């Protein structure tokens, strides 16, 4: 088995936020460093994700994503989900909203073509259990 390099797009957060790199630029930079695998963070680099009550990202986004993966010889490996429990200033997310958010991340991960999802530490186990059959 050959070990291959993977890079989290989180590594490029500074360049992305300051406008030095866009999503494609981050992927290109990772590929230039010899990365094959790409870990994604939708909230950070995928515009419109995840606005409450908004539909999933459009198919055109995923078409462009797969074109970029092909162009740079990379592959999505894992999606790093972030459960924004403080999305609303007046209250925390309730259980059903957290499950819905995780289900959206599961759909997103599948559409990206990633094989896994990394659930962050603040995601309650009962939310993961409720979303797992999805």
PLM-predicted stretches and their roles:
Residues 20-21, 59-60, 100:
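Residue-level recognition of alpha-helix initiation/capping sites
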Residues 22-45, 111-113:
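Catalytic domains of carbohydrate-active enzymes, especially glycoside hydrolases
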